[in-house]
């Protein structure tokens, strides 16, 4: 079934849809912007890209759909864990999408999602206020 036909079926009735604030969002896997649109839908396309946080809380997992084996959903996804510093991680994602000519329209969205995940994994430094001297009278 073509992606356009699947989109016509799925766009208004899906278990992943969330409608609030006069907008429609989607919680499906591999939807980089969580938007209910044809481009970012993670279910209907033959090639999809997803970025998730790694299980151990350090790094990201890039999920890509294989071109071959579309009829076998259990083996149709390739998961690559990237556990480097932020610049190298974003560069790796950029190269995975650009060098393989794999959905270049999703490159910037994947980089932004990975950047947000990496930023959330950074430890928060607590700023201590300098203690005020006590008044001596």
From Swiss-Prot:
UniProt keywords, alphabetically: Acetylation, Cytoplasm, Isopeptide bond, Phosphoprotein, Ribonucleoprotein, Ribosomal protein, Ubl conjugation
Main location: cytoplasm
Residue positions, PTM N-acetylserine: 2
Transmembrane portions of the chain: none
GO MF terms held by the record: structural constituent of ribosome
UniProt KW Cytoplasm keyword: yes
Modification Phosphoserine occurs at: 115
Presence of keyword Nucleotidyltransferase: no
Cross-link (Glycyl lysine isopeptide (Lys-Gly) (interchain with G-Cter in SUMO2)): 58, 65
Assembly notes: Component of the large ribosomal subunit.
Function: Component of the large ribosomal subunit. The ribosome is a large ribonucleoprotein complex responsible for the synthesis of proteins in the cell.
Family: Belongs to the eukaryotic ribosomal protein eL28 family.
Protein name from the UniProt record: Large ribosomal subunit protein eL28
Organism this protein belongs to: Bos taurus (Bovine)
């Amino acid at each position: 079934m073509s992606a356009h036909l699947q989109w016509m079926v799925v766009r208004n009735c899906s278990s992943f849809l969330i409608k609030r604030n006069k907008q429609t969002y989607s919680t499906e896997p591999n939807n980089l912007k969580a938007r209910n649109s044809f481009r970012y839908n993670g279910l209907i396309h033959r090639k999809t890209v997803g970025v998730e946080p790694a299980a151990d809380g350090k790094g990201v997992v890039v999920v890509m759909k294989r071109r071959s084996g579309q009829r076998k959903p259990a083996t149709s996804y390739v998961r690559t864990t990237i556990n480097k510093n932020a610049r190298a991680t974003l560069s790796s994602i950029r190269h995975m999408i650009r060098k393989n000519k794999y959905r270049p329209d999703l490159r910037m969205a994947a980089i932004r999602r990975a950047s947000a995940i990496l930023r959330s994994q950074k430890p928060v430094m607590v700023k201590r206020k300098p203690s005020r001297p006590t008044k001596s009278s």
